[in-house]
Amino acid sequence: MEGGGGSGNKTTGGLAGFFGAGGAGYSHADLAGVPLTGMNPLSPYLNVDPRYLVQDTDEFILPTGANKTRGRFELAFFTIGGCCMTVAAFGAMNGLRLGLKETQNMAWSKPRNVQILNMVTRQGALWANTLGSLALLYSAFGVIIEKTRGAEDDLNTVAAGTMTGMLYKCTGGLRGIARGGLTGLTLTSLYALYNNWEHMKGSLLQQSL
């Protein structure tokens, strides 16, 4: 019976030692002096090779609410594609309206459906081609101005819009160039004002206080 009791105690002690409760074990001080093979620990409690903590690339912590901005070249693809698809949808709706208006005296038949479909595709392509060309010119001028100045700000937006309007209306003579440049200047200035409205409002409030 004694042997059985002793065996039971040994088993209990072994399980307790395995789970970290009771029995003889190693203290934290003893473990702190054990060297880690192939490692150069920074502290006794660091069980990770410091070589894995080295970053190969630079990483920056941005302020709260700040986002990484994209350049003109990255935004050019989104601008051109978005303008083409959006205006193509509006052009298709306008073509549907015109097609229904022009064929209102015709009965619902295959010729009428074909005529309406032709009007929808024609208007959608026309509108998409027009605004797509403007978006392409605007993006190209924006990229060129950004690379030339080495900065990205609202001045690039206004300058690119003005030059786009001037080039698009260059076939209309000096009056057409002036009219197109003024239109581009006005639209891009309003866009820049809209983007900076909150900042301008905060600045005015600080000055008033």
UniProtKB/Swiss-Prot annotation:
GO terms for cellular component: TIM23 mitochondrial import inner membrane translocase complex. One of its GO terms (biological process) is type 2 mitophagy. One of its GO terms (molecular function) is protein transmembrane transporter activity. Its main location: mitochondrion. The chain crosses the membrane at residues 73-93, 125-145, 172-194. InterPro entries: Tim23 (IPR005681), Tim23-like (IPR045238). Keywords: Membrane, Mitochondrion, Mitochondrion inner membrane, Protein transport, Translocation, Transmembrane, Transmembrane helix, Transport. NCBIfam families: 3a0801s02tim23. This is Mitochondrial import inner membrane translocase subunit Tim23. It comes from Pongo abelii (Sumatran orangutan). The gene is TIMM23.
